[in-house]
């Protein structure tokens, strides 16, 4: 004997069982832990709600530098990257580019290079349209699609924003 009406009932029972099994209390957002590196500035959590900051075009600049296990600092235009000691296991030829566009963005290569310890990226937005919103650094595609909003420290009085990065790619200033 076939029970044609039992499939919808089974689906309802399974849905209720899965719904009850998946609850684990408060699932709301939590504040990120305090980071002493950023001090008393505003820290922006990693939630992609950003738009790229509109700026007067930067001129294209390319800087090449070899950085090794001792670390080093690379300055490209008004932006800088500080790689700490121990972040790289061997000497690496790094290319930093300040990309000419209506957003402030930088691109680092070799693309995909990862660090054993995060590097600190500092970006200026002195040439950008001023907004009251907090600024952050975002990881983008080459077409400037935002992939990830990084936890950042905005210092509006000096018009710089700082974040740590764990790999090379393209980054831009957002709000």
PLM segments and residue spans:
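Bacterial Sec-dependent N-terminal signal peptides
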Residues: 16-55, 175
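C-terminal beta-strand-rich structural cap/linker in extracellular carbohydrate-active enzymes
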Residues: 160-175
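Secreted/processed peptides and extracellular or luminal domains of membrane proteins
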Residues: 28-29, 59-62, 89
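Short beta-strand segments within Ig-like beta-sandwich modules, predominantly Fibronectin type-III
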Residues: 150-155
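Sec-dependent bacterial lipoprotein signal peptides
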Residues: 1-21
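Proteolytic processing hotspots in large secreted/extracellular or virion-associated proteins
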Residues: 40, 45-50, 54-57, 67-70, ...
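Predominantly extracellular/luminal regions of secreted and cell-surface proteins
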Residues: 63-94
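Intrinsic-disorder/low-complexity, polar/charged segments enriched in Ser/Thr/Lys/Arg/Asp/Glu/Gln
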Residues: 60-62, 78, 118-120, 160-162
